[in-house]
Amino acid sequence: MGHDADDPMAEGEVGRVGVSISNVEDMKVLFDGIPLDDVSTSMTINATAPMLLAMYVVVAEESGADVSRLRGTVQNDILKEYAARGTYVYPPAPSVRFAMDLCAYCAEHVPRWNTISVSGYHIREAGATAVQEVAFTLADAIAYVEAARDRGIDLEVFASRLSFFFDAHSDLFEEVAKLRAARRMWARIVRERFGIESPRAQMLRFHTQTAGVSLTAQQPELNVVRVTLQALAAVLGGTQSLHTNSRDEALALPTEESATIALRTQQVIAEESGVASVVDPLGGSYYVEWLTDSIEAEVEGELSKIDELGGATAAIEKGHYQKAIARSAYKEQKAIEEGRRVVVGVNRYAADEPARMEILRVDPSILEEKRASLTRLRASRDARAVDESLRRLAEAAERGDPTMPPLIACARARATLGEMSRAVERAFGRYRPAGSLW
């Protein structure tokens, strides 16, 4: 959201929602002793992805690493923020341009970096159906490829560096079919819509995470079973990497014990079940093939609607995604409340006594430590250099010039995330959605 750790808007978030990074010095602590040109780093960050990558580049430079050899992934998928997650800062159109600034910079200076991970996960967690998850994700990916084309970025290189992020929900066969449909649809889109013949560019490289929204606070031990089935669906659907949620995440951040069980779940599937030894093991099943075809046809229909609206960005600006997701979420919740959709331990087979489980409690002193650290940073840096770097950043954003070089200059001067975000906001404005979801 572009807030520093000492911003009142960040209170309650620090230490609970990812790693708190407000400046280059925070990033240095995080990667202390790690040779950045020998590892691959993944950052789940979107609206402020260019700022975080700029800090990462400066840490690499100052540690003596070769920036051209840096490897990793930044999510940088801003479109889904307007439809699902909500951590946007600027309006959609300039935000896509900002994301492309990062992509263009990496294409020239950090060629081994995966610049966008197009995320259906958050869309599904917000209440979308499996069909909507695939359709909106592919539509967003199309919008990014079109933006890269307009920017003059080599499309074969750009598409080869795209990755995807999907949800693994509880309907095993639907999830397998969904992933199979997405894979062949993306290959066809890249080949037919954009004329890219490279097999690598046509690959649907994707990560999957089990469905956090399916976890229950009631009888949380049952979440181990849910996660196992969802993980199995992801593997059967061909995921290349996987995150399994922990049993207690409906209650709090996971304990070490819960996270270990989640990891062991993956290891049992990988090492004991044999399902990972076969490519597309359910291919040829009458039901799976029929369901894959059905999902693909429905997704094609959704993509046609989005094209008619002018593409993903226009569809989001018109509220199409948001309304569709809200309606689907309402239908699902109503089905649960009426008992038509069974959730074991919640609306059927409920326990008489509430669950008792040890949960992780975050030390509140973390926030005070972060605030003190920022105070020391602001007192020790060259204020004039910071102001000058922020002025140049705002001017670049206003003129439509590439923003990565001035962002890197800001990071070198020890400007904070919040300061950089506000400088860009002066040019782009802040997005405030209007209108009803219904």
For every predicted segment, state its role.
Residues 25, 53-54, 184-185, 226, ...:
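A generic alpha-helix surface/boundary motif
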Residues 119, 135-144, 160-345:
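Active-site capping/gating regions of soluble enzymes
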Residues 1-169, 174, 193, 200-207, ...:
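Catalytic alpha/beta active-site cores
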Residues 3-4, 79, 252-253, 325, ...:
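Short Asp/Glu-rich motifs
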Residues 15-22, 41-52, 62, 87-98, ...:
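Catalytic cores of large soluble enzymes that bind and process phosphate-bearing ligands
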Residues 256, 264-267, 271-438:
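Flexible, glycine-rich loop/tail regions that form catalytic "lids" or insertion modules at the edges
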Residues 32-36, 58-66, 100-112, 140-153, ...:
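Generic secondary-structure signature for well-ordered alpha-helical cores
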